[in-house]
Structure formats: structure tokens, C-alpha cells
Amino acid sequence: MSLFLEHTKPLITTMLKPNNTADLVRDITAALKEGTDAFCLEIELMKTECRTATDYKDIFGAMDNKPCYITDYRRLNINDTEQSDEELTEEMLFAFSLAENVKLFDIRGDLFDPSPDEITYNEKAIEKQIALANEVHKMGGEVLMSSHPLRFLPYEDLLKIAKAQQERGVDIVKIVTLAESENELRENFEATLKLKKDLEKQFLFLCGGSHCRKHRLLAPLLSNSLFLSVQRGIDGGPQPQMDDAKKVMELSGIENGKWKMES
């Protein structure tokens, strides 16, 4: 099984948006035909009645053994009943345990202690995050830690969050900010190159906002990380369609839609 860390080119990863099993399987089938490398199942978008072992097995089983990563974000959860971080974690661990191709586990940077910019500095919460990362590793998985400040950050603040994540035993650092002007876009490109130099871990630095598109299309090439995209005809917001992601990779000299394991 190919893991999310074992690639030499940006990994085209299809973000799955439907809220029910039938539509998820439909979109997975379409993404496979378009040539996706991997998937992300956003559990927070799924209906409660679809979060069962049978449904998860149908969903993961449709992926043709492509690697999958999972999220369960508090701020996007469509559940009618608010779930605690502990409940969200148990829900993720349950899904994670059901299929061998589910390999990447997203831990929010403020898990167990909701905090500004989705990053906590509370020692007890950090200890629980580290313990969770260790548990996922023991299960044979990899860990991504994500923070979504969803505002522009100067590099010093960005690096502080990235290094805090890096120190918590995770494999991939992920931060999502904003670019609402050409100047913020330029600084985000500069930050991408600086992070590549200043971080030891693989990272995924993205942005939303009115000026995010260039960064969304080019940043994965600069960081050689995951290329988050959606399949043809799906509204992914700031996430580009897979066709565009593959075209950028092809034009940049990277084999279209493919990646090779390091020898």
C-alpha cells in the first residue's frame, strides 16, 4: 500500500464532498476514471446515518486500494447534535480501523482545546494530541496536523504554528490562511519557499480568499506535497478541479497525474 509520505511528485488527492454513501461511491468512481492518486473523506460532511461500518467499508472499498486520508472538523460538522472533540476522535479512529487503504489521519491543531487560529498551546491538550498521533502510528498510519486560521498571517506567525505542529509527532504540517490581495498572495508564495527551508517535516500550506487560485495551483509543486482537488463538475470552492491540477503538473514538466515511489 502506497503511503502519503512515499511519493516524489505532488499527490493528486480528490476531496470528497457528498453527504451520503451512494453519492460518495459515485464520485469515487468518477475520480478514479479521471486518474486521481488518492482520496480525502471529509467525515464532517457525511450524514449521521451514513457513519456506520457498512457504509465506511462500501466507501473505502470503492477506492480501488488508492490511499485515503480522513478529516472530521468540528467547524464544518453537519451533525444536528454537537460532538465533543473526544467523540470526533473516536469517530475517526473507528473509520480509520476499517480499511487498509485509510492511511492519513488529520488531527486539528486545537484538538481538545478549541483555540484561535486552530492551534492550542495548552500542555494537557498537546499531550493528548501526541498520544493520539502515537496511537495512529501504532495502527500503521500517518498523521497530518491541520490549522485553519483562515486569515492572512505574516511569516513569523505562520512559522510559529508550523513548528508547534511539527513538534507534536506528526508527519505532515498543514496550514490554511487567506490571500485577499496581490501583496498577500506574493507573501504566501514567499512563505511557501521559506517553509520548505525552515521545516523538517513535509508540509501543506494553502490559502483561500479572492487571490488564492494561483497559490492553490502552484504551491503543491513548490512543496512537493498533496494536491487537493475535486473531480470534474464539482464545486470545490478554492480547491481546483483535478483536470486543472493535472494540466499544471504536465506543463511544469511533471508526468501528468503520476508519481513514483522512491527507490
PLM regions: where:
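Active-site beta->alpha loop and helix N-cap motifs at the rims of alpha/beta catalytic domains
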Residues: F4-K138, E142-Y155
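Catalytic alpha/beta core domains of metabolic enzymes, predominantly
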Residues: G109-G257
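Intrinsic disorder
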Residues: W259-M261
